[in-house]
Amino acid sequence: MKTAVIQFPGSNCDADALHAARLLLDDGAQFVWHTETALPEGTELVFLPGGFSYGDHLRSGAIAARSPIMNAVKAHAEAGGYVLGVCNGFQVLTEAGLLPGALSRNKELHFMCKPVHLRVENNATDFSRAYGPGQIIEIPIAHGEGNYYADAATIAELEEGGRVVFRYADNPNGSLNDIAGIVNERGNVLGMMPHPERAVELLLGSEDGKGVFESLKTVKK
């Protein structure tokens, strides 16, 4: 699956994202700088990595969501192309309107960096088919603003539509309904705060993140 990893000023998980993509999806995966106005021809997956884009000025992801490349990312998503936003990438997706809700300060008001357990809430998406229903997986988090919030109507819509893909088994940040990752209505855009790209090799402590990439690899073109 041809993959483009978007780089914003302040991205710091872009190399991890590229490594995971090259290891599991596309050995020719490449970086795309935020000032570009088009994605590489044939791009199938856009990966928005974690970090502190633009120093988190205004709000996390707010400026990055208005970068030139995001017009192409939106068009890609609207055409049915896959988009994966991790951590700051999830924040960018909400700021860009590609996913509902917002990510606010952690309930403890400090940065958290540790492995957490997630429950696979919906394994029928193109991002989660490699997992079993209800499977508990270990994926690291690293964020200060990962507390997912949306109004009651939006939360109900997410829950009723099976759009909560990953849920915290032991909520670390105060996210409503223990939400760790959601998809859009069409199912081609996933945002999640935990970092699957940091859990693709046993050397890193867990291989449980591989399922996200292995799921995408099974998508029929």
Curated annotation (Swiss-Prot):
Keyword Transmembrane annotated: no
Name one cellular component (GO) term.
cytoplasm
Upper lineage is: Bacteria, Thermotogati, Deinococcota, Deinococci, Deinococcales
Q: Pathway involvement?
A: Purine metabolism; IMP biosynthesis via de novo pathway; 5-amino-1-(5-phospho-D-ribosyl)imidazole from N(2)-formyl-N(1)-(5-phospho-D-ribosyl)glycinamide: step 1/2
Q: Where is the Glutamine amidotransferase type-1 domain?
A: 2-221
Domain of life from the UniProt record: Bacteria
InterPro entries given in the database record: Class_I_gatase-like, PRibForGlyAmidine_synth_PurQ
Subunit structure of this chain's protein: Part of the FGAM synthase complex composed of 1 PurL, 1 PurQ and 2 PurS subunits.
Compartments, as annotated in UniProt: Cytoplasm
In short, the EC number is 6.3.5.3, 3.5.1.2
Which protein, by its recorded name, is this?
Answer: Phosphoribosylformylglycinamidine synthase subunit PurQ
